[in-house]
Design a protein with these regions (language model features):
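Feature 3881 marks metal-assisted phosphotransfer/nuclease machinery
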Residues: 125-127
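Feature captures the catalytic cores and cofactor-binding loops of soluble hydro-lyases/lyases
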Residues: 22-23, 27, 31-46, 50-123
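Short, structural beta-strand-to-alpha-helix junction motif
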Residues: 1-4, 97
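Short secondary-structure junctions
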Residues: 11-18
């Protein structure tokens, strides 16, 4: 799926429409704990989070994530959208819960980005 498909599956609003949303999404990670995001994600991972502060964009930038989906209908300040655009990190917004958002993406074939004992299937393909 690309980010346009993700937006469609999640009934999401695209908050950074000037960015390229044709990039492919292979795996996703849902978290509000940014230390977990840094520890367990791989480049190009799609992050689903309820966080709406600038640290979520800075973390996505450091981890080279493929985009951010703000869940639970949390209000996103314009400054967060501007920072995401400046960092070239696609930002989407949905009223769905984290649980339902992750479930819809999983049903659509997006893989989880978690470590499985003895398996390297959690690694997102290089894009």
């Amino acid at each position: 799926l690309n980010l346009y498909d993700v937006a469609s599956k999640l009934d999401a609003t695209i908050l950074t429409p000037k960015l390229d949303l044709s990039r492919q999404v292979y795996c996703a990670y849902g978290a509000d704990l940014l230390s977990d995001v840094l520890a367990f994600t791989r480049p190009s991972t799609l992050l689903l989070s309820g966080l709406i502060n600038i640290q979520v964009v800075r973390t996505a930038e450091m981890a080279e994530l493929g985009g951010i989906v703000v869940v639970r209908g949390k209000p996103v300040h314009h400054s967060l959208q501007e920072l995401a655009c400046a960092c070239k990190i696609p930002l989407l917004w949905t009223e769905l819960t984290m649980f339902e958002s992750c479930g819809r993406l999983y049903q659509s074939g997006i893989k989880p980005c978690i470590k499985d004992a003895g398996c390297d299937c959690h690694v997102c393909p290089s894009v």
